[in-house]
Amino acid sequence: MTNFKIAEPQTIDQVTSLTIDKKDKYKLMAGGTDLLAEIKDEIIEPEVVVDLKSIPDLSYIKKEKNGVRIGALTSLARLAEDTLIKNEYPALHEAANSVASPQLRNMGTAGGNLCQRPRCWYYRDPQVKCRKKGGGRCFAFRGKNKYHAILGGGLCYIVHPSDLAPALIALDAEISINSPKGNTTIPLTNFYTLPKINVRKENILAPNEVLREIKIPLIKKEEKSTYSKFIERGTWDFAIVSAAVKGTVSGGIFRDITIVLGGVAPVPWRLTKAENIIKGKKITEDLVRKATREALKEAKPLEENGYKKELAEIVLYRAVLSLL
Amino acid sequence: MEKTKKKKRKTFTRRDFLKGFGGGALSAAVVPQLLAHDIDSLRTKKGNIPLFSKKQISLTVNEKKFSLVVEPAETLLHVLREKLNLTGTKTMCARGECGGCTVLLDGNPVYSCLYLAVRADGKKITTIEGLATKEKLHPVQQAFIEKDGYQCGFCTPGFIISSVALLNKNNNPTLEETKNALSGNLCRCGNYSRIHEAVAAASKNMRRA
């Protein structure tokens, strides 16, 4: 691994007052499992790694009267084990439990999971200079693209690898960001950006901004949620397609429903059209499949990933069934 | 960084050579305490952020205390193997995918290949070398021997550490729970069923004891 210096800030303000004068000079590190793998693979070569874990009190799960607050450095293992999360936000519990392996869940953090870089094999190959790394083309477009995006591609066909993101967006989560300009709280769904906004990045975070906290509103009465993840191996992997569903259901009918897919686009993908079709109707496999097809009409699969459209129908149906 | 040092062909075995080298590196690393003051700082409007190109750390490995100087890019795996001479923890993929480097960090299994040594300051580490007490093997180690829980044996230290972590929390796991707890470890010989049998046997013995 190329050497770097390590900075140990004591407050978030110190991090946000760092001046970013040179590209990729500083990199912020939470759990480090993604960042260090990128440094080892020579995809990035930061001069300074800023260790966010040296800042005290960024790991917590607090229940309050209008919801739950989760510190960005809370480990995925702690999130997966928490009984409040398990009972009230099963989608988040299931998503956290499905991330990687026990070892990585002990190391990785909630905030880090939301900010991780894509798994595209062209991006992860140090020999390949794709658009995301400042090059001139997306090699997945006419290359090997079995795992790539069917929606929202264009300049770059990565899929966002986070499991927590679809679940949290379905749960209407917000995030608090500390930035040099001040602190803001935004819906998590507004955090992620498509390649056409900035092909080099997957979200709005600047190098000296810190995702500090995740806030999830209280669940409504009788509200249920789930996260269903399809992977290719028997054990841990990134999602090929995943579906986070939240809603209130009675007598086999959803009174309201929120659906977010993972693994299909460079950002978590909300299926508003499918929600409208499913809402108020008796759930059948046909209905869910038709709703998914309708919502994915605009999908433009590449040569090898057309199967994701049909897979999304099944994954969503499984998720919906588990809430009935 | 975790690449094995070029070996010289002499009458030593590879293991002797590597162990000898590790010992030398240990004394070299522990002596020059002055290096620990290799500190710079990043100036910001909200105060200076300490910046290290070398750092003195203290950690407890298998109940023994060590104090040494490490560079920021050194992983815990590197320090264990190359500086503390504990070569039981294996370097396999070195990128957090296979589990060969699994150690317990304050009781929880982690991949030491993706864990920076600077972060291990003040932590308690348990490696495969820390499980046996004197001549008596840990029940998990004993069960792996009795149930043929390994073939080539290279992934075994990682599997044993993950199994110990599981049984410390849950002394009577179901097969499903065992599979989940060991899902971060790969065995390229494909010996999984024997490994799961070994964990079941160890669990039985530990409950009886």
Predicted regions and their residues:
Chain A
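C-terminal structural segment of proteins
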Residues: 1-324
